[in-house]
Structures are given as C-alpha cells and as structure tokens.
C-alpha cells in the first residue's frame, strides 16, 4: 500500500518597511537589504525561520509584521 505523503507547508511572515534607512547604522541598512527591503512601504513574504525573526528584531523600529501564516 502506498503511503500518502503531505508536504509540510512552511510558515511564512509578511513584513513591510515603514522606516527609512537614511541616517541609520550601516548594519541596519544591510539587514533591510538582507530581508529584501530597500524602499518605503514595500512588502516581502519570507519563510518564518529563526534567522529571519532575528533580522526582523534587529530592525523592528523600521519594519512592521503584516501577516503571519
């Protein structure tokens, strides 16, 4: 008998940039670029991993979590 396999859906988090990286430390600017954000009010849907959560926490004053699935 064949086993029914279900692909585990990866959890995702959608973030939006709400703050400007101008006059911010270089490490914060690079973190935003690492998250795929570089212009105001852009949104990205990323896989919800500990590394992504850490990056969001590092720039939490510049981004907003829109949706978590």
From Swiss-Prot:
SUPFAM superfamilies: Ribosomal protein L30p/L7e. The keyword Ribosomal protein applies. PANTHER family: LARGE RIBOSOMAL SUBUNIT PROTEIN UL30M (PTHR15892:SF2), MITOCHONDRIAL RIBOSOMAL PROTEIN L30 (PTHR15892). It comes from the Bacteria. Signal peptide: none annotated. GO terms for molecular function: structural constituent of ribosome. Part of the 50S ribosomal subunit. Pfam families: Ribosomal_L30 (PF00327). GO terms for cellular component: cytosolic large ribosomal subunit. GO terms for biological process: translation. This is Large ribosomal subunit protein uL30. Keywords: Ribonucleoprotein, Ribosomal protein. Belongs to the universal ribosomal protein uL30 family. NCBIfam families: rpmD_bact (TIGR01308). InterPro entries: Ribo_uL30_ferredoxin-like_sf, Ribosomal_uL30_bac-type, Ribosomal_uL30_ferredoxin-like.
């Amino acid at each position: 008998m064949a086993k029914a396999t279900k692909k585990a859906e990866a959890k995702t988090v959608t973030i939006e940039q709400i703050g400007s990286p101008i006059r911010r430390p270089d490490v914060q600017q690079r973190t935003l670029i690492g998250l795929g954000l570089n212009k105001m009010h852009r949104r990205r849907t990323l896989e919800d991993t500990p590394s992504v959560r850490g990056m969001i926490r590092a720039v939490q004053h510049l981004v907003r979590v829109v949706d978590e699935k």
